[in-house]
């Protein structure tokens, strides 16, 4: 199929080099007409305002607009676009919802932005196999709305309502990661258009398998292990190509469909909040809860600055203090056991104001506030942008790094707060910065680099879920080493020899 599509594109424009790319912002007329021939004239734009909208995300990186924006309607058109750009040496930048935090959509070398939001179909739901196939325009909220009456749900939930293929591209995570894992644990297969237009199914066409295996355990089991797999799906067939493309940030190909692992909706759910006298006490409680093998589904930390911002933005009435938001899934009996054990642990660490949220509306209000923490922080300093760090460390080192980071933040003179998915060792400093103030921006970046190196020194990572993007490339080299980076470069060179896929990111 991909070969036929590529041949069709070449027949439309049979001579190589018909359009040598001009300076950034200037694709020649023939090339723009070629784009229109693939997707239709109404699905191509070179308007400055449209290009600028597609040259920025929610990061502090300055806008780098593409030369043109295209909206393909199906995978065949994506394949033809890739083949066309490959033949002419024009960079391609994938675009989903634009909610990334690392400058992943910035067109640093110009080129064509491929906006995939018009491809928004849920292609196949396999309830018996706990899997679903979605196109790149489907967001996590849209998928879960579609699944509402099926008894299944997809748990990976970053703060923004991101596109699911975009989440796969960045290796995203969320508040449920402590129990259900990240995108790396929940992607079974990917359909990828390679830089030259060929079509790849990373686990084979139509297959709903993954590498690795977890035993089958009933979902209602009280002490339920994270990342349990319902239905034995495993494969040892060759290299794990799915794992290669998850987290590749659009640098190896365009993800045009993903097969996701679904989970049974829990029988019962209870959320809880509790406040602490100090950051140390809150984070210590997190470690103790996990070490006690309480199968918490969510455990989120908000420092007192973030708690105050969330109270104001989301109209909560929580105590302004370091706080944990928790959620438990299971049978009614299991929940009672989990809540009792958790309350004992947090009280030993000085917790107060322990409250339960059993009703769905009350829980939704609580977790909506948590998901809106980024916007709550931005609202405290209007006109500024946010910079979010993203380190992740082994759970045993979490109290050390969070407490030290809080002390550094207080001493820095910067405006910021701490929030995070502490159940898996991942937390964020959300720093507010005037992007036009070079001195302040420099201090923010220095703070972030120092924190990244501290995480590496504690055997952690510089990014748990946001990706490398433009800003963490040096930290990536320090994390994986020279041989690791060179191996990545070699893989990139084989798949994308011209370096056209989302240039300037990761490597």
UniProtKB/Swiss-Prot annotation:
MF terms (GO), sorted A to Z: D-lactate dehydrogenase (cytochrome) activity; D-lactate dehydrogenase activity; FAD binding; flavin adenine dinucleotide binding
Residue numbers of N6-succinyllysine PTMs: 358
Reactions the enzyme catalyzes: (R)-lactate + 2 Fe(III)-[cytochrome c] = 2 Fe(II)-[cytochrome c] + pyruvate + 2 H(+)
Keyword Mitochondrion: yes
Top-rank taxon: Eukaryota
Broad class of the protein's primary localization: mitochondrion
InterPro entries on file: FAD-bd_oxidored_4_C (IPR004113), FAD-bd_PCMH (IPR016166), FAD-bd_PCMH-like_sf (IPR036318), FAD-bd_PCMH_sub1 (IPR016167), FAD-bd_PCMH_sub2 (IPR016169), FAD-linked_Oxase-like_C (IPR016164), Oxid_FAD_bind_N (IPR006094), Vanillyl_alc_oxidase_C-sub2 (IPR016171)
A cellular component term, taken from the record's GO annotations: mitochondrial inner membrane
Class of the enzyme per the UniProt entry, highest EC level: oxidoreductase
GO biological process: lactate catabolic process
Record keywords: Acetylation, Disease variant, FAD, Flavoprotein, Mitochondrion, Oxidoreductase, Transit peptide
Coiled coil: none
Domain FAD-binding PCMH-type: 62-265
E.C. designation(s): 1.1.2.4
Compartments (UniProt record): Mitochondrion
PTM-bearing positions, type N6-acetyllysine: 36, 315, 358, 445, 472
Disease: D-lactic aciduria with gout: An autosomal recessive metabolic disorder characterized by D-lactic aciduria in the presence of normal plasma lactic acid.
Quaternary structure note: Interacts with CSRP3.
Protein name: Probable D-lactate dehydrogenase, mitochondrial
Organism the protein comes from: Homo sapiens
Lineage: Eukaryota, Metazoa, Chordata, Craniata, Vertebrata
